[in-house]
Amino acid sequence: MEINICSKDFIINVPSEGHGYVESDFVLHGLRIKNNTNESITLVDISFDLKSSCRIVKTINYIGEALESLVQKFYEEFRQTSIYGMGLYFGSTTFWNQSNFAKSILLGPNEETGIFNECFIVVYNSVIDELVVNVTYLKNMEKYKDSLRVPVVEYKNKNEYIFPVKGAWSTCGNYNNLLDHRPHYSMEFAIDMSQYNSELKLMHKENMDNEDFAAYGADILAIADGEVVDCYNSYSRISPWNWNERKILIEEYGFLPAQCGNYVVIKHANDECSFYGHMIPNSLTIEKGDIVRQGQVIGKLGNTGLSNCPHLHFQLMDGPDFLGNRGLPCYFSNLKDVTGMKIHMLTENNLIVHAE
């Protein structure tokens, strides 16, 4: 039995504390289970042991009908997923071999199955620091159990960052919204940013033009010193949400412009990279290869690519590849909440913050 995860060597936990307890919050983006034997096997149980300081705090099991449904649903959802979808969800186009997906819990030689975006939120008196994946199966009427131990860690940024816009902003798509950016490998900790008008409305009339939005045209700032390693400046469209229609634009312009509009990728020290998307066409003030300084204006907030209103899509990654590198939490040094209290990370969806 071969067991792999697509969260590389560890899973990122975003813990929070309160009332003497710790809430651990992490996602296993992909679990791959492959029958690497020469005989058929039957899956009996897939379980997850959540551990804190070597002690099992909670166990989650897929058995019986739940396991059968899990395998069948995985086959139906991912057997025809595009290479772009595989990159978005798992950070790799080769993590799974789609032609070898099993249709049931009976796995023939070289057949494989998996789990997509298993979310864990656990409240305990200490942080969860290890996930143990256990796979129990039958082969020739004998029961076997294989396991994989995965560290669960709290990630700390390697550099100091400022917020990519100034003033008061509404943020959404945060990591604790499990149905937005978080299922995607590089976008797990992505943030969308926009602004309300004086009446605290994002949309305040019908058929609004881009210029009617408070955020449109705002300066976008480099969050730290670095080198521009990729950018696009001439995409003028709002891409359709229909995949078949968007594929035409991908073939013409490339995946990233069709997805994110005009964008900038900056490589900072220690191989952390920031990404800024949906910018106004021809508003970029930098070019590939330029060295930028923290706080430098790199372009204007716009409404291009896969976007439903003017906003900035921002994310931090462990490399420059939107379809291959891992999303990272980003902590900011110049943020306050609406009460004036200093905060470092956006821990709630639809949070209003002020960047000094």
Predicted regions and their residues:
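Acidic, glycine-rich catalytic/binding loops that coordinate metals and/or anionic ligands
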Residues: 247-250, 290, 315-356
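Conserved positions in beta-strands of structured domains
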Residues: 227-229, 302, 317
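Short, small/polar residue-rich loop motifs at catalytic or cofactor-binding pockets
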Residues: 214-216, 259-260, 284-285
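Short hydrophobic beta/alpha edge segments that flank linear recognition/processing sites
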Residues: 292-305
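Short histidine-centered loop motifs in beta-beta connectors
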Residues: 272-295
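Short glycine/proline-centered loop/turn elements that form peptide/ligand docking sites
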Residues: 2-4, 285-288, 303-310
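Polar/charged, compositionally biased leader and regulatory segments
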Residues: 1-224, 339-356
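Zn2+-dependent peptidoglycan hydrolase active-site motif and core
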Residues: 225-280
